[in-house]
């Protein structure tokens, strides 16, 4: 399996009473299908996976698979600070018919580099299923160093990495480490602002937050960059940049859910301990949305 292009990290919409909004989720998925993204990620950071019950997680996977019907890839976040739990969640994703798992570095318990390797080695041994690593030190407290990433990549199920270090030196090290020896190892940006720079340096695409609202624009940017049309990609990037910054003005997914709500799309509030966007930031976000080309914005 080869990952390339635009993958939307879907939010999880909630009703006013805080329940999973199943119809809202279906609508959001249909928007992504309409704009022909390459895949969606459910149960990731943007999907508020830490606050979802196991029943809700299973239902979200079911809805995604039912709506998509194999037309694009469905990637499921199955990571945990518990190796056994990560194995169980990855096995569930496989059995339900997903295409791949996105597995974050174990968080909170801060394993060593050897522990990180053994974590993924154990998952690889337990479940034969495509796995994309998720490196995001700002949330996990631990960085997958490039030499460790190289070791993990030799495991049979590992197909790529969502690189969200934000460190351009590390990003370059990762790209160079695989450019010759493993060119099909997918190196995906986890930071919308670095989509264009990463592809220009040799990356393969993006797992995007902002494409929840502007999938058409992000699809055009990614396609242009992957096809070497950096002039076009740069124009789109520059037009989107204010919104990209605003989408992270508070902790993700608070701002993107606010942006969806402002556009009359299903979102709802985040679950505690995440709370609603501040009034000041909401006003700023609304102004930025008004300044975007309106044909880019999905509306309810």
UniProtKB/Swiss-Prot annotation:
UniProt entry keywords in alphabetical sequence: Amino-acid biosynthesis, Cytoplasm, Diaminopimelate biosynthesis, Lyase, Lysine biosynthesis, Schiff base
Sites marked Part of a proton relay during catalysis: 45, 108
Residue ranges crossing the lipid bilayer per the database entry: none
Pfam families xref list: DHDPS
Catalytic residues (positions): 134 (proton donor/acceptor), 162 (schiff-base intermediate with substrate)
Keyword Amino-acid biosynthesis: yes
GO MF terms held by the record: 4-hydroxy-tetrahydrodipicolinate synthase activity
Cellular compartment(s): Cytoplasm
InterPro entries: Aldolase_TIM, DapA, DapA-like, Schiff_base-form_aldolases_CS
CDD domains named among the record's database cross-references: DHDPS (cd00950)
EC number: 4.3.3.7
GO cellular component terms, semicolon-separated: cytosol
Reactions accelerated catalytically: L-aspartate 4-semialdehyde + pyruvate = (2S,4S)-4-hydroxy-2,3,4,5-tetrahydrodipicolinate + H2O + H(+)
EC class name: lyase
Main location, first listed in the record: cytoplasm
Binding site residues for pyruvate: 46, 207
Key word Disulfide bond present: no
GO BP of this protein: diaminopimelate biosynthetic process; lysine biosynthetic process via diaminopimelate
This protein's pathway: Amino-acid biosynthesis; L-lysine biosynthesis via DAP pathway; (S)-tetrahydrodipicolinate from L-aspartate: step 3/4
PANTHER family xref list: 4-HYDROXY-2-OXOGLUTARATE ALDOLASE, MITOCHONDRIAL, DIHYDRODIPICOLINATE SYNTHASE
The protein's role, per its UniProt record: Catalyzes the condensation of (S)-aspartate-beta-semialdehyde [(S)-ASA] and pyruvate to 4-hydroxy-tetrahydrodipicolinate (HTPA).
Quaternary structure annotation from Swiss-Prot or TrEMBL: Homotetramer; dimer of dimers.
Family: Belongs to the DapA family.
Protein name: 4-hydroxy-tetrahydrodipicolinate synthase
Gene: dapA
């Amino acid at each position: 399996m080869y990952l390339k292009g635009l993958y939307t990290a879907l939010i999880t919409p909630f009703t006013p009473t805080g329940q999973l909004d199943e119809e809202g989720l279906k609508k959001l998925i249909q928007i992504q299908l309409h704009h022909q993204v390459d895949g969606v990620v459910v149960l990731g950071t943007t999907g508020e996976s830490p606050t979802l019950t196991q029943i809700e997680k299973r239902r979200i996977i079911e809805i995604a698979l039912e709506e998509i019907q194999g037309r694009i890839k469905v990637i499921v976040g199955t990571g945990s600070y518990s190796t056994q739990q990560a194995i169980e969640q990855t096995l569930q994703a496989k059995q339900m018919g997903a295409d791949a798992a996105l597995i974050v570095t174990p968080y909170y318990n801060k394993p060593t580099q050897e522990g990180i390797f053994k974590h993924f080695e154990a998952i690889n041994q337990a479940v034969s299923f495509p796995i994309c690593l998720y490196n995001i030190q700002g949330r996990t407290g631990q960085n997958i160093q490039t030499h460790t990433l190289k070791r993990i990549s030799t495991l049979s199920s590992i197909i790529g990495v969502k690189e969200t270090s934000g460190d351009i030196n590390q990003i370059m090290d990762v790209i160079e480490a695989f450019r010759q020896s493993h060119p099909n190892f997918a190196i995906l940006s986890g930071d919308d602002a670095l989509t264009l720079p990463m592809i220009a340096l040799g990356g393969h695409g993006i797992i995007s937050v902002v494409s929840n609202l502007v999938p058409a624009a992000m699809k055009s940017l990614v396609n242009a960059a992957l096809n070497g049309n950096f002039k076009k990609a740069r124009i789109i990037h520059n037009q989107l940049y204010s919104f990209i910054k605003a989408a992270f003005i508070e902790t993700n997914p608070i701002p993107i859910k606010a942006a969806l709500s402002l556009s009359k799309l299903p979102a709802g509030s985040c679950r505690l301990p995440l709370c609603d966007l501040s009034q000041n930031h909401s006003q700023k976000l609304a102004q930025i949305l008004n300044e975007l080309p309106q044909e880019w914005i999905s509306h309810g």
